[in-house]
Amino acid sequence: MAIAPNTRVLVAGYGLPAEFCVTTLIGMGVEIDKIAVATHREDNRNCGLHSMLRLRNIQFTTAAANSEEFYEFGANFDPDMIISMHYRSLIPGRFLKLAKKGSVNLHPSLLPAYRGTNSVAWVIINGESETGFSYHRMDENFDTGAILLQERISVEETDTAFSLFHRQIARAMLRLEEVILKLDQGDPGFAQLGEASYYARELPFGGVIDPRWSEVQIDRFIRAMFFPPFPPAVLKIDGKVYYVPSIDIYRSLMRGIPS
């Protein structure tokens, strides 16, 4: 389905989700000159987006979110809506106010639970049986705006942060067009209900296994830390550092380490 003619959309995003969002907008009939992108510098996870923007001649900026250059980019573009797809900084309130129809963000949890960052890892560490994703309207705080759409996803006993993250992304992308239409049509969403929780950007427990944990806890932690190309969970014993990508390797290491 198409959105209102001449709608101007600013995508604030990073990596594959932002790339998919731009593709979705083009597929919905949004003209190239009515799409702008705020992103981060090109790296291994953001190179696809940068290539697309250059190929399609889509205007973009990599200015820091708290900079005047960032604000001026948005003000000059004059967006009707802002879509945040894994943008890695808090977008200032005055920037959000530029969007006449408002803004929406994709968050990888069932808000208000697991606000903040590393939500996928913490879901596994805490032994949750389900998680999901939330598309929510944006305000000046992290992950507190009204919900436009949520979907639940089961957490499997063998899930790693890597597998769960990609399953969330795949499912969330299937619902993106629906969310864009909600924003375009002025859907106010509904208030976040339930107990809120928040997790900071720091790596859970510094990425280090505590051998005093139960094996169930250790298995969850190892799976939560598995997200290549980043290092897996670490085991430190007698001044030595061991990288532990699976519970089987942990067991093998423990059998070979003198007690």
Swiss-Prot record:
Q: In which pathway does it act?
A: Bacterial outer membrane biogenesis; lipopolysaccharide biosynthesis
Q: How does it assemble?
A: Homodimer.
**What phenotype has been reported when the gene encoding this protein is knocked out?**
Deletion mutant is completely O-antigen-negative.
EC number(s): the record gives 2.1.2.14
Upper lineage is: Bacteria, Pseudomonadati, Pseudomonadota, Alphaproteobacteria, Hyphomicrobiales
InterPro entries referenced in this protein's UniProt entry, alphabetically = Formyl_transf_N, Formyl_transf_N_sf
Residues that coordinate or bind (6S)-5,6,7,8-tetrahydrofolate? 89-91, 139-143
Describe its function.
Involved in the lipopolysaccharide (LPS) O-antigen biosynthesis. Catalyzes the transfer of a formyl group to GDP-perosamine, leading to the formation of GDP-N-formylperosamine. In vitro, can also function on GDP-3-deoxyperosamine, thereby providing an enzymatic method for producing a novel trideoxysugar not found in nature.
Q: Which protein is depicted?
A: GDP-perosamine N-formyltransferase
Q: Which UniProt keywords apply?
A: Lipopolysaccharide biosynthesis, Transferase
| Catalytic class of the enzyme | transferase
